[in-house]
Amino acid sequence: LSPWIGMLAGGALSALFALIIGYLSVRLRGPFFTLATIALAEVLQILAIYWRGLTGGGSGLLVPFTPGVAAFMFESKRTYAYVGLGFLLATLAVVHLIERSRVGYYLVAIREEEDAARALGVRVLRLKLLAIVISAFFTSLIGTFYAQYTLWVEPPYAFSLELSIQFALMVIIGGLGTWVGPLLGAALITPLNTFLRAWLGAAASGLYLVFYGLVLVLVVLFMRQGIAVETRLAFRRWVTLRGRLARG
């Protein structure tokens, strides 16, 4: 099976699975929804580890290296970088279209005040499920790209709580409700993670999570809405102040 076809099929299956799980858990709010998704990830990790015939168990699966466009494998890392950039631009384009559409405005209304949005006739459940399904589809596509790049798929890593925490931190630190926020968060967390792992080494396994916590505390204290949002607000305040000073 071609990895390109497998990528689309995996995306469709992930979207279907997300629809089912989302329908069962999306009615939960706040920390309860978060706890439900974390618990589900742990259950899936256990199932994946014990389903050795499909996943390779705790050792994972090695992907044979057969370079070529048809095999979605390339000898040059630069080519992978271009393909990854293409995925990023495509994802940002979809996010931008949703953000500027009626669906995007409805999602903002749900985020700000769910009960008020429901009272105004917004189909909260349907839109939440749509957001979850789209997210799962694109996450699956990028997961295929990652597997083709690393040539290795490991269930303990794919379903790890640590990875989920990293993704959440990227969004929170970068700025919720913006497309540029997660990019800024990833640009900060990814090199920080690499540096801390190299600096601390295996002797201090897990200690880097303390640094994540410190970064999160600093952001909550001084940039509560995230880097992107706070920077935009600071720029607007500066422009307003400059205009007032110019008018005397």
Residue ranges and their predicted role:
Residues 1-248:
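Transmembrane alpha-helices and adjacent helix-loop boundaries
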